[in-house]
């Protein structure tokens, strides 16, 4: 299985989800001055921001991470979290990233996710990597 990369704000909702998921993962730093590079294909797990609009939905740290060509070339899919209070824009950061990076939007969950979300993501991530061509 390949990597998961995620961002979590200071609310730590996405971080708690990732801890419960129990799969190897790299966190995009909260501090925008810190940078990371990922050297293998990965699925990005990202919260949605902005109170329900598309503008500002993707966290700045994630934009900076994906603006690095090295990182952008290795993204293979996206999983988004959000708040159902955002209505149609729930998890819309996943939409934005999938469209801009040309990768599938694999799943979305609310806030810290439920046990069902954890189970679905574990299963889905495993199946995704098994179906993806080795050269991808």
Curated annotation (Swiss-Prot):
It comes from Salmonella typhimurium (strain LT2 / SGSC1412 / ATCC 700720). HAMAP family: NrdI. Belongs to the NrdI family. It holds the Pfam family Flavodoxin_NdrI. One of its GO terms (molecular function) is FMN binding. SUPFAM superfamilies: Flavoproteins. The lineage of its organism: Bacteria, Pseudomonadati, Pseudomonadota, Gammaproteobacteria, Enterobacterales. Probably involved in ribonucleotide reductase function. It comes from the Bacteria. One of its GO terms (biological process) is protein modification process. This is Protein NrdI. NCBIfam families: nrdI.
